[in-house]
Amino acid sequence: MRIILLGAPGAGKGTQAQFIMQQYGIPQISTGDMLRAAVKAGTPLGLEAKKVMDAGQLVSDELIIGLVKERIAQDDCVKGFLLDGFPRTIPQADAMAANGIEIDHVIEIDVPDEEIVKRMSGRRVHSGSGRVYHVVFNPPKVEGKDDVTGEDLSIRPDDEESTVRKRLDIYHEQTKPLVEYYGNVAAQGKTQYNKFDGTQSVAAVSEQLAKVIG
């Protein structure tokens, strides 16, 4: 079961990724975690990546693909894997195909931009404990105050509306073209592509996912 999960930041990919991992017993592979693990393990590719990152440069697609191949050859990927946050661009998707990395399911969690802005910019955090609230979906008892300590809540820089909109712009520019790309791959019978309405409840999306993946 080799799965790619697509969707904008805040679409609920993380929640569904947890469900897929538990349901099917496959690991979630994020490029960030993979890079850190390879660097820590001191593999040849990990050392090469460390050199690039220490110089403040971006790790090349070629190197990332090498790390992906190395990672999916490990024992815990025997049943499959879930790729999260990769590929992000069409050249990366092409490179995966060229390296013989086949994908069974491409899953897109689709949520309109305005809904994502509402979800993310409404988050409030108590920095001392990490407790998270939401002004609409999970408000504190007293506006702007932590329920337990009564201390002020804050907005994380990542959740500022302007930051959320910038991240959405990058997603539409870089990653949205992958939707069309994998739609074409699916039309050729080389993978299955399914889009889910991420504005539904978490349970409803999980149930639909399970039906499609089988």
UniProtKB/Swiss-Prot annotation:
**Positions of the region NMP?**
30-59
UniProt region (LID), positions on chain: 122-159
Q: Which reaction does it catalyse?
A: AMP + ATP = 2 ADP
Specify which residues bind AMP according to the UniProt entry for this protein. 31, 36, 57-59, 85-88, 92, 156, 167
According to UniProt, this protein's pathway is:
Purine metabolism; AMP biosynthesis via salvage pathway; AMP from ADP: step 1/1
Q: Name one Pfam family in it.
A: ADK_lid
Its EC number is 2.7.4.3
State any GO CC term: cytoplasm
Provide the alphabetized UniProt keywords: ATP-binding, Cytoplasm, Kinase, Nucleotide biosynthesis, Nucleotide-binding, Transferase
At the top level of its lineage, which domain of life is listed?
Bacteria
Q: Which CDD domains match?
A: ADK (cd01428)
Q: Name one GO molecular function term.
A: ATP binding
Query: Do you know which NCBIfam families this protein is assigned to?
Result: adk, PRK00279.1-1, PRK00279.1-2, PRK00279.1-3, PRK14527.1
The family database entries (HAMAP family) matched by this protein are listed as: Adenylate_kinase_Adk (MF_00235)
Function of the protein: Catalyzes the reversible transfer of the terminal phosphate group between ATP and AMP. Plays an important role in cellular energy homeostasis and in adenine nucleotide metabolism.
| Summary of subunit composition and partner proteins | Monomer.
Q: What is known of its domains?
A: Consists of three domains, a large central CORE domain and two small peripheral domains, NMPbind and LID, which undergo movements during catalysis. The LID domain closes over the site of phosphoryl transfer upon ATP binding. Assembling and dissambling the active center during each catalytic cycle provides an effective means to prevent ATP hydrolysis.
Write down what this protein is called. Adenylate kinase
Q: Which organism is it from?
A: Shewanella denitrificans (strain OS217 / ATCC BAA-1090 / DSM 15013)
